[in-house]
Amino acid sequence: MSRGAMQPSQQKLAEKLTILNDRGIGMLTRIYNIKKACGDPKAKPSYLIDKNLESAVKFIVRKFPAVETRNNNQQLAQLQKEKSEILKNLALYYFTFVDVMEFKDHVCELLNTIDACQVFFDITVNFDLTKNYLDLVVTYTTLMLLLSRIEERKAIIGLYNYAHEMTHGSSDREYPRLGQMIVDYENPLKKMMEEFVPHGKSLSDALVSLQMVYPRRNLSADQWRNAQLLSLISAPSTMLNPAQSDTMPCEYLSLDTMEKWIVFGFILCHAALNSDPAALSLWKLALQSSTCLCLFRDEVFHIHKAAEDLFVNIRGYNKRVNDIRECKESALSHAGSMHRERRKFLRSALKELATVLADQPGLLGPKALFVFMALSFARDEIIWLLRHADNIQKKSTDDFIDKHIAELIFYMEELRAHVRKYGPVMQRYYVQYLSGFDAVVLNELVQNLSVCPEDESIIMSSFVNTMTSLSVKQVEDGEVFDFRGMRLDWFRLQAYTSVSKASLGLADHRELGKMMNTIIFHTKMVDSLVEMLVETSDLSIFCFYSRAFEKMFQQCLELPSQSRYSISFPLLCTHFMSCTHELCPEERHHIGDRSLSLCNMFLDEMAKQARNLITDICTEQCTLSDQLLPKHCAKTISQAVNKKSKKQTGKKGEPEREKPGVESMRKNRLLVTNLDKLHTALSELCFSINYVPNMMVWEHTFTPREYLTSHLEIRFTKSIVGMTMYNQTTQEIAKPSELLTSVRAYMTVLQSIENYVQIDITRVFNNVLLQQTQHLDSHGEPTITSLYTNWYLETLLRQVSNGHIAYFPAMKAFVNLPTENELTFNAEEYSDISEMRSLSELLGPYGMKFLSESLMWHISSQVAELKKLVVDNVEVLTQMRTSFDKPDHMAALFKRLTSVDSVLKRMTIIGVILSFRSLAQEALRDVLSCHIPFLVSSVEDFKDHIPRETDMKVAMNVYELSSAAGLPCEIDPALVVALSSQKSENISPEEEYKIACLLMVFVAVSMPTLASNVMSQYSPAIEGHCNNIHCLAKAINQIAAALFTIHKGSIEDRLKEFLALASSSLLKIGQETDKTTTRNRESVYLLLDMIVQESPFLTMDLLESCFPYVLLRNAYHAVYKQSVSSSA
């Protein structure tokens, strides 16, 4: 440009204001962090609390800013030792204070320049210039106030300087000025009031220009309501008309910011209050609106006390002091209720706005101003509440507790989301607006200017050209717009045209200023939507009010009608990083961590609340399902039978038991059940959880639905285990069928959650139910598989071994036997077909496999004991094996055998366990046949078509597959695996094989002893014996098959040998005359038939060759005849 160097337009006011304002925020951030660090014992510089330096610190503070190092060696001796560390660790603090001093110098220099240039300020005309000027004044004032609040400032500066003096022999060059500044600004406002006397006119002019903006922004809710503020539907005919104003940027200017300008501005240029009624009016209005102002973040300034303390000492200010006291009373009495009503209005206004824009996003173009006004108004009210609730000066706190604050924040977030989502819609609208209307109007205005210097003309022509060149195609092509240069040029132009000697005075061309302010707003709608959202709706201040933030969240969750808005709190955590500044990078990590921890906590609490509601619903549904269990209809059946036989057993007046389903009958629609309330609360909370799929917080992605999924998995796991009602002391456990009913009820409720939240509940089922099929879950806790396995092994089967329970093949169940001590459970209710199928449904193939393996482990321990007994009798058994055709010799050898009863007892236990396993396997097969019939039939085909010449390893693999599907196999793979692990290193394979052969011999020759047992009587009704010896058939076949598979022997040959020995031994008792010995001879004979029937390797023809069939037939006749006579 061609102007002289000394001209005011060359002072670069725009650039300096921009840079100093940004630097001021950075300095505030650093000073704030120093204040907080000094206030926290953990973060405080260690030298300030070091006992060894205490006397030195006190001395330095007392003498500050003077430096005396010569005569105080004793007090400063410790300082001498640590001088290098002090220099190193306090440098950041010291030079921050130096930076504040330099910032103060630059601000004072700029303020003097502005005064010298006699700059014209009017917020409605040169908005950017006036705003930046007022911002600078307030930032400067705030910085000096915050500095004065650091109690340790003298100690830090003094310590550093003394360490510098001791190290370098002289004070730091900045220290004299810095020390003097600290002393001068002990009472910063008083000092600044003197300092601002020369700047009074400029500052008061700028402030008084707010009379066109502040009073109409600071209205009551009733006035807003009457004006139908922010309503798009109040005048449908104008809905598509662009929202216009002569003061566009003032419409969304923060009320909080204006109040700070007015309060601090008129404290600094207080003379205007006495001379200008407009100034006094603004001052009073601001004092009546709040009791405290936000200095920076959570640092507040109590307006009335500070102003009164300053004015009370000024002569002739009694009237102003009285004004302050009156305004304070008014603020305490009415401000709370006024702001409460405003928040109430804004809730409904923002809801309407968000709803209309969601339906018609195209309205974001013409009505963008309404959106940013709404956001700004709501943000101001929320910040006001947050600040005042934390600094209440009134006994009644009702006005400062807003349980509906979440709703207001939610609608703000909804509007923000609309702006982000439909940004291209707004860009498209305003690109056309700028090129088709703004450029034309501005061009006309420029053409009609009477005087327009060359420089100003060039700038304005560039504006017109920039706007004219815009097209919709640029938006469609995704071109990135950048109008920052244009906005800075307008800022410069404001500075050039607002000085007193300007050829083109903006004060004389207000229309130009207003038009350009509108154009600047339109450019921001194209390239700065994100920045606009931060400017109008940033709520990062919540980061510094953690306790209030958490309290608001808890209140939101406690109120069912507000829980749908609880997602607002995690969403606010996304704002936190916007409060950081590049001049203080070290706080980014701290604020980032706080945002992450708060977001995590909020989402976790929301998920927990939803989980608890779901659990309550599940509990109710489980109770309702329980009412439908067959056991509950016994009383109804009994009453029906009695009624039919005309027996009156019930007492008169006995209330009739409610039938299931009564809860669904409503007398009227106003009746609300507990379940209704739970469903309503859940749907509200789930709306919140489902509101956003994910959110970004400090480069971390949070997915609210995953929190719910995780909590549901944990709770479902605990609930399933809890519903087993396993009591280790009393050994009580829920029946599998009842547990299955409860689990299905629980799963039905969980499936219904998919109607509320888009979560994959099938994944939850798969994760949880698959874990329940294992011994332990992912947290190392016992599962229903381990609980039921332990119960069946340690409780049910142990009582079978003790003779209290018998296996009834006819019923395919274990049944209690009459004993002196009644059992606490009915075995049939846990082991019949329906219960075993329910168990299979619950445990699945994996769980049933674990159950089988546990059973096999018990069998293997019994076989190990049997082998020991065989080893003890190995010589006798070897002889008996080859002497079965010598009756006398066999009798003599038999008498030499030991532990015969123990062998039979252990083999019976093995048989019982195998019988239980066959029940479980059969149930598993039935269940899988329903679920996967085609797969089961394929496995069955595999098993049934194994060629005889197939390698045993291949056959065992097929058997393992078949066993996993619940199919019976010739050789039990699980039993083979269990017995294989018993191989002893000290015994050769040949010896092991011999022991296995002799074990079968031992069992065969021991069988006749069973006939003498009273309990060995066969019962046709149960198709077995009460002492479970019928289970020997299964034990003998399965053990033989497993052992001779392991030792690669012929199973068929060994079983033939067993049959020969057993039949020979049993035929002998036919010749016995002792009735005691032959008491249940016929019942024992039947065991041979059972063994052959059970075996895939033996045939009836083979039995016929060893044991006359006529004996078997007679035995059956005898036992049936005996059972008829005993029952008669």
Curated annotation (Swiss-Prot):
It comes from the Eukaryota. Residues 651-665 have a biased composition (Basic and acidic residues). Residues 640-665 are annotated as: Disordered. GO terms for biological process: cell migration; cell morphogenesis; cell projection assembly; cortical actin cytoskeleton organization; neuron projection morphogenesis. The chain crosses the membrane at residues 995-1015. It is found in: Cell membrane; Cell projection, Lamellipodium membrane. Keywords: Cell membrane, Cell projection, Membrane, Transmembrane, Transmembrane helix. GO terms for cellular component: lamellipodium membrane; SCAR complex. Part of the WAVE complex that regulates lamellipodia formation. The WAVE complex regulates actin filament reorganization via its interaction with the Arp2/3 complex. Actin remodeling activity is regulated by RAC1. Plays a role in neural tube closure. This is Nck-associated protein 1. It comes from Danio rerio. The lineage of its organism: Eukaryota, Metazoa, Chordata, Craniata, Vertebrata. The gene is nckap1.
